[in-house]
């Protein structure tokens, strides 16, 4: 199979959508001899920050000398990014071979796997066959009934910042969502939690007590910023002084605190991770599309924030790094997001909006988004294509100005490709 044929099969229309439950992926992996049971894991869930936290953890573990797998979603530039070993995406020929192997197994299942379940099975099989020492595995959505929860008890079950998102599936309260996400906590693991409201923390604590799993909460009081510019951050956390992190924004320091707390938990469980590996790993962390500066003159920033909590962080970062600067906002969003609350955060900082339609079946049409954004009293232009939107953004932004591309991770890859062509 060619790569195009592989991706066409993976994205088959009849497999689209999310169907919670572990029976299908468990059956599929069982047909392969359950390769997922032969690997160690860090399992990471949360509403915001889980991808960045995964990237930091994988980078530190790699710096410590461990063969480290990383499983995340969605991708920005190429599908292969979703599964990596030591920072390298799965090769095209390996991906093709795995799909050719799994295809007949999946096709003969009475209850066939969803797209996410198939992709997860591919990743878990690859990591096992490559004999990874440890895999950092990001939950797709929720936790308890997410396909990634087919893995055995992880070394650490990490819960990043929890808020309201995917409410039609996960629940309408933060506590209900936390209960679903806490489903990744299993007997034999150690849970790590981003500090949260007492009612939410109690939900997680109840799950930990039920599973007999110890719980460690990251200590944000031990976190302090030393230096913060568009080139990166220097910070202290507990005994760690002068740590460097290329990811920008105060929210990334809090994510780093969760990652460092997880590293301490791994040490308690016998993993050898020295301070030099921590320093090197954090300094080398790469996670595109999170307040990422991709061009200067004008300054162009990509941010994949896609819910109100993300927009709070984005707005805070704009105020911190670009105080008083008018910002051109190129944006697109998925229709099922709470985009009203999202743009309430961003509108006061926007000089103008340019709307586009992300390449996703759930995308809100650019014209409909433009009509909504006009309520904020700022100039709004709807563009028929992302490339047209990027051209308009560059025309509307002076050389000493700033443009922010945001609203959906599904938008960013096309923005970068368009920037390379205009």
Role assignments for model-derived ranges:
Residues 408:
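Active-site-proximal loop/hinge segments that shape catalytic or ion-binding/gating pockets
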Residues 110, 118, 131-138, 154-242, ...:
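Acidic, Mg2+-coordinating active-site environments of NTP-dependent enzymes
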Residues 18, 22, 26-37, 63-152, ...:
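ATP-dependent carboxylate-amine ligase catalytic core
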Residues 194-207, 211-216, 230-234, 299-302, ...:
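C-terminal helical cap/extension that packs against the catalytic core
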Residues 1-48, 52-67, 76-78, 93, ...:
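N-terminal leader/targeting and accessory segments in enzymes
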Residues 71, 194-195, 207-229, 245-250, ...:
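Beta-strand->loop->alpha-helix junctions that form or flank phosphate-binding loops
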Residues 38, 134-137, 145-158, 162-166, ...:
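Nucleotide phosphate-binding/pyrophosphate-handling subdomain across enzymes
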Residues 57-62, 127, 266, 346, ...:
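Hydrophobic alpha-helical packing residues
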């Amino acid at each position: 199979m060619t790569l195009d044929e592989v991706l066409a099969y993976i994205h088959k229309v009849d497999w689209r959508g999310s169907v919670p439950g572990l029976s299908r992926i468990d059956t599929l992996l069982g047909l392969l001899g359950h390769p997922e049971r032969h690997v160690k894991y860090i399992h990471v869930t949360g509403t915001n920050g889980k991808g960045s936290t995964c990237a930091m953890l994988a980078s530190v573990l790699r710096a410590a000398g461990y063969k480290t797998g990383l499983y995340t979603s969605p991708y920005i530039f190429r599908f292969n990014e979703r599964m990596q070993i030591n920072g390298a995406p799965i090769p095209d020929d390996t991906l093709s071979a795995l799909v050719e192997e799994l295809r007949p197994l999946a096709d003969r299942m009475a209850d066939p796997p969803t797209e996410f379940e198939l992709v997860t099975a591919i990743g878990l099989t690859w990591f096992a066959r490559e004999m990874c020492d440890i895999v950092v595995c990001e939950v797709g959505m929720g936790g308890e009934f997410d396909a990634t929860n087919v893995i055995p008890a992880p070394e650490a079950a990490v819960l990043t910042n929890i808020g309201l998102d995917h409410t039609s599936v996960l629940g309408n309260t933060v506590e209900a969502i936390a209960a679903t996400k806490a489903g990744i906590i299993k007997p034999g693991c150690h849970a790590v939690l981003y500090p949260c409201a007492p009612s939410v923390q109690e939900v997680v604590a109840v799950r930990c007590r039920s599973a007999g799993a110890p719980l460690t909460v990251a200590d944000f009081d031990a976190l302090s910023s030393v230096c913060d510019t568009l080139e990166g951050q220097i910070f202290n956390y507990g005994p760690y002084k002068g740590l460097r992190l290329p990811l920008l924004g105060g929210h990334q320091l809090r994510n780093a605190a969760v990652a460092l707390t997880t590293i301490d938990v791994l040490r308690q469980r016998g993993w050898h991770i020295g301070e030099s590996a921590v320093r090197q790993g954090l300094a080398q962390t790469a996670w595109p599309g999170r307040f990422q500066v991709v061009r200067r003159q004008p300054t162009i920033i990509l941010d994949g924030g896609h819910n109100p909590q993300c927009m709070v962080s984005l707005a805070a970062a704009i105020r911190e790094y670009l105080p008083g600067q008018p910002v051109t906002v190129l944006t697109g969003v998925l229709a099922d997001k709470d985009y009203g609350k999202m743009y309430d955060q961003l509108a006061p900082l926007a000089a103008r909006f340019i709307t586009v339609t992300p390449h996703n079946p759930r995308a809100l049409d650019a014209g409909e988004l433009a009509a909504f954004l006009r309520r904020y009293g700022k100039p709004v232009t709807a563009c028929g294509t992302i490339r047209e939107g990027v051209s308009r953004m560059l025309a509307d932004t002076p050389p000493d100005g700033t443009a922010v591309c945001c609203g959906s991770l599904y938008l960013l890859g096309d923005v970068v490709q368009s920037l390379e062509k205009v």
